Amino acid sequence: LLIDILTRLRTEQDSYYLLFNELLHARVLYEKSMYQECFQVLKKVKEKAVYYENHFALLVAQRLELNYLLTLDFEDMDEQKLLNKQYKMNNTLKSIRQLNEQSSLYELLKYRMINRGASRSLEETQKLDDLVTSEISIVASAGVENFEIKKNHQLFQANYFITVGDYKAAFNSFVELNKLFEENSHLWNNP
């Protein structure tokens, strides 16, 4: 009972809880053969997932929709519409992959910062260049506006500049990060 109450409260505060809870509703509707209602819920989840930039919920909603359409023998669907849905899902996967690659680079940078400390020589700074080059490549190839990519980029830059001792540049990255958050308050989760 307590976990149910806490989950309900978090659903009102956190888009992850909200979206995944609605995905569960869609599954129940499908299991009860309420297909139209199920697809309506999935459509709303996809719209909200795009708004909140929740690529994981979007991917699950897209996959469920295609699985359900397959089970229903693609009733009332033409091939072009199916291809469009598959294309959108592949773009979602691409975004998730880019976020994961960028997060991996940031984690590696933080690991090196923690275990090696600040760069004390040109040689130590050059050892970080591979991470910087890879991270900038991911940001440049992202193509679409993406809050998480921008956030991770500013965090990466700030921590890199701290590591190499360029505190003014690190401060500027944190200022940009703060500005990014202020411009995207709808993406905040309220703990």
Label every model-predicted segment.
Residues 1-32, 70:
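Intrinsically disordered, low-complexity protein-interaction/activation regions
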Residues 22-31, 63-72, 104-123, 151-166, ...:
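Tandem amphipathic alpha-helical repeat scaffolds
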Residues 75-130:
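Alpha-helical repeat/alpha-solenoid scaffolds of the HEAT/ARM/MIF4G superfamily
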Residues 12-20, 57-59, 66, 99-103, ...:
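Start-of-helix signal in alpha-solenoid helical-repeat scaffolds, especially tetratricopeptide repeats
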Residues 43-51, 84-94, 130-142, 171-187:
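Amphipathic alpha-helical segments of tetratricopeptide repeats
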